[in-house]
């Protein structure tokens, strides 16, 4: 049943690890989960709010000399386009937040971290705890399924053919240190009235092997024809 379950949860404790590290009494556990969601949503909203509208950013592809012009103007559903994941570690008086991000230009600006910490403090409304935020840049951005999904979303919103967008996403992974990748898009592809699914695959993808380190993401894309769903599996290595 490897294809019927979330690949990340299926491998939790073996090749995947938790993104939240804290202990709580059973009666306070739900409050801790809600607090984690507020922290992650606040960080994503901060990045979306401070993004320059209509600005363009050039990303040089690792797989070729092609330079991709990446439009930063996103809708409200794409606020986390460069964040791969956020780790939260809680102590008695400190909440450590580690943001793993592909392109941390926005958060490297002077005063950005301090401003984000103030926003989090207001959101959580906790007097006894302070925030300690650190940024971790992802070494190989196009090895991350979230970033590839954002690239596909940008292409589809600009009326690029879905097959061409999938092939370009596969090309971006060619020089990344991975052993296999699969991209699947479902919905009203090309504006057709009947929804269908299309996929493209390169290399191996052993979904039923628990020791296989597989990264996965599911990403919704809002288009004029409705919502398209993008799923990306990346086979990194086998332990």
From Swiss-Prot:
It is found in: Plastid, Chloroplast. Keywords: Chloroplast, Plastid, Ribonucleoprotein, Ribosomal protein. Residues 43-139 form the KH type-2 domain. GO terms for cellular component: chloroplast; cytosolic small ribosomal subunit. GO terms for molecular function: RNA binding; structural constituent of ribosome. One of its GO terms (biological process) is translation. Pfam families: Ribosomal_S3_C. It comes from the Eukaryota. Residues 50-74 are annotated as: Disordered. The keyword Ribonucleoprotein applies. Part of the 30S ribosomal subunit. NCBIfam families: rpsC_bact. Belongs to the universal ribosomal protein uS3 family. This is Small ribosomal subunit protein uS3c. The lineage of its organism: Eukaryota, Viridiplantae, Streptophyta, Embryophyta, Tracheophyta. The gene is rps3.
